[in-house]
């Protein structure tokens, strides 16, 4: 469609970044967009924004100048070079995908064992699960976070996989996840699914929603 109507194809790689493939998600699916945008994941958290693109598109920016608070700062560039070298040398994206699949498998296995209805989605290194109980979903996710916190995990339905997430840590997460889902199973079947009275704080709410 973009070619048909002569519209530049832009990939927002700010969230996906390098998690799926070296160089970005567009490398994984073998599409060369007109523009791809990356953020500080490229520099492992240091201030940096990256815009890459085809020559005929990028050359239009040569006559413009946009000031920035960090435009003279070199730390971000040095960090990015180091990160890219480390990422490629250690095949980080492959490891993130493997760890993410392990998390998805835990969710699927435990939820099936305790008959708790969830929906699993997201890319492997960015896995997401949501409860499937309609109006109870927010209460259940709040309870899940509350109980996981007691076991040492600041957890939610989304999981941003990191290289530092060791197999030992994932196993520990699995045990905690099962403990909490066993409680959820009990509440659903013996407490009429009433989670709100068990919460120590208010039910989670979405103050900001990404329109993308």
Regions flagged by a language model, labelled:
Residues 1-212:
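Conserved N-terminal phosphate-binding loop of PLP-dependent enzymes in the Aspartate aminotransferase
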